[in-house]
């Protein structure tokens, strides 16, 4: 699960490199977030020529998580890293590319644009 101060990698080409979660919204009374949950995060590292600068507060959706997640069919899914994709106020991705696989749970949570940009859906 993604909690407060968790470091997230950015899985898109928006210009941010690393994020720190400052407000998870999801299960456990809003204290932790899982796959497909929207969180508020602060940019810790950014590319030098990007529009998104270090210190900016952004919204993002969790696309990969190290902690295993149980699916309804009884299987478990786990990734090698904690990663997120930056989204705007409407819920569409800020970047135009998504790097690495994303979880199938994003399709259930109506993030179809992110799913279509991803090279692989697991």
From Swiss-Prot:
One Pfam family linked to the record: Ribosomal_L14
Alphabetized CDD domains for the sequence: Ribosomal_uL14
GO biological process, one term: translation
SUPFAM superfamilies: Ribosomal protein L14
InterPro entries associated with the record: Ribosomal_uL14, Ribosomal_uL14_bac-type, Ribosomal_uL14_sf
Keywords: Ribonucleoprotein, Ribosomal protein, RNA-binding, rRNA-binding
GO CC entries: cytosolic large ribosomal subunit
GO function term, MF aspect, one: large ribosomal subunit rRNA binding
HAMAP family: Ribosomal_uL14 (MF_01367)
Family: Belongs to the universal ribosomal protein uL14 family.
Subunit structure: Part of the 50S ribosomal subunit. Forms a cluster with proteins L3 and L19. In the 70S ribosome, L14 and L19 interact and together make contacts with the 16S rRNA in bridges B5 and B8.
NCBIfam families: rplN_bact
Function according to Swiss-Prot or TrEMBL: Binds to 23S rRNA. Forms part of two intersubunit bridges in the 70S ribosome.
Protein name according to UniProt: Large ribosomal subunit protein uL14
Organism: Solibacter usitatus (strain Ellin6076)
This protein's encoding gene: rplN
């Amino acid at each position: 699960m993604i909690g407060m101060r968790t470091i997230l990698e950015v899985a898109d080409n928006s210009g941010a490199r690393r994020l720190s979660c400052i407000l998870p919204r999801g299960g456990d009374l809003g204290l932790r977030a899982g796959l497909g949950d929207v969180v508020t995060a602060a940019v810790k590292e950014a590319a030098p020529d990007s529009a998104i600068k270090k210190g900016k507060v952004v919204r993002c959706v969790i696309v990969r998580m190290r902690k295993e997640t149980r699916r309804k069919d009884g299987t478990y899914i786990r990734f090698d890293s904690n990663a997120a994709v930056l989204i705007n106020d409407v819920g569409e991705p800020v970047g135009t590319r998504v790097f690495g696989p994303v979880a199938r749970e994003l399709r259930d949570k109506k993030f179809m644009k992110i799913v279509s940009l991803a090279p692989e859906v697991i």
